[in-house]
């Protein structure tokens, strides 16, 4: 029943809301969108991963992208060699040149996501793009993923278990500024068992794709962290600013 507001129906309701009451806007791609501002969906992940059945979600590719982030990699050719081409369009020679990144080798996306998770605040160099080729200690910066894990271990009820992929000082060095850019974890305790929840915030969400994809992405990350720190996964909360559907996807 739609009245139960299962996660799947929350997702479909959000799509309907965008189509029915969204504002038509132009965008950087020239495609145009229907958009609303401010949305939220909550997913129970205590027993399963929320793979929405109304949209194909490539589970294996999402895992590879997550591991790529966790390593701090920013070379899309690492994924491409595995047949994963999700970043190829945003790292072509033409795309990089249009961003003013003529000095980047094709395939390099600059200081975003994984680099910011593992080396926030460090100066970026294209030699850092493939972390398997050198000792990453030379990069420096602040390791946010380690910070999160340290807090989960020694101060799990902290309200500061946060990572960010948004560094305004480096936006011009990025092939594409991060869309999902704020992640907060929360630990609760029930009957002596700790439960881990995650809220991720997207400044811009292509809701036909991003909601499904990134919900699974952060569910997997939460499962990994919960397992490492003797916790149970509880909830994923998706929050989006500009929540839109591209006009080409309306049908």
Q: What is each stretch, according to the model?
A:
Residues 1-250:
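Terminal, non-catalytic protein-protein interaction segments that mediate quaternary/complex assembly
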């Amino acid at each position: 029943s739609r009245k139960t507001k299962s996660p799947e129906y929350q997702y479909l309701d959000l799509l309907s809301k965008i189509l029915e009451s969204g504002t038509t806007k132009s965008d950087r791609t020239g495609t145009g969108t229907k958009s609303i501002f401010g949305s939220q969906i909550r997913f129970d992940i205590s027993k399963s991963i929320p793979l929405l059945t109304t949209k194909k979600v490539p589970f294996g590719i999402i895992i590879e992208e997550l591991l790529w982030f966790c390593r701090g990699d920013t070379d899309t050719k690492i994924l491409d060699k595995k047949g994963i081409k999700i970043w190829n369009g945003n790292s072509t020679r033409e795309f990089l040149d249009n961003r003013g990144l003529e000095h980047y080798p094709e395939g390099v996306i600059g200081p975003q996501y994984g680099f910011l998770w593992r080396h926030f605040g460090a100066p970026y160099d294209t030699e850092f793009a493939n972390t398997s080729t050198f000792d990453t200690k030379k990069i420096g910066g602040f390791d946010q993923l380690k910070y999160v894990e340290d807090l989960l271990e020694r101060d799990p009820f902290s309200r500061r278990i946060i990572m960010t992929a948004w560094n305004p000082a480096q936006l011009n060095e990025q092939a594409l500024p991060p869309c999902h850019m704020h992640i907060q974890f929360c630990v609760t305790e029930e009957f002596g068992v700790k439960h881990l929840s995650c809220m991720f915030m997207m400044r811009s969400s292509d809701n036909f794709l991003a909601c499904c994809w990134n919900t699974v992405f952060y569910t997997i990350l939460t499962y990994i962290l919960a397992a490492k720190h003797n916790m149970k996964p509880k909830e994923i909360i998706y929050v989006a600013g500009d929540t839109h559907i591209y006009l080409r996807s309306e049908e």
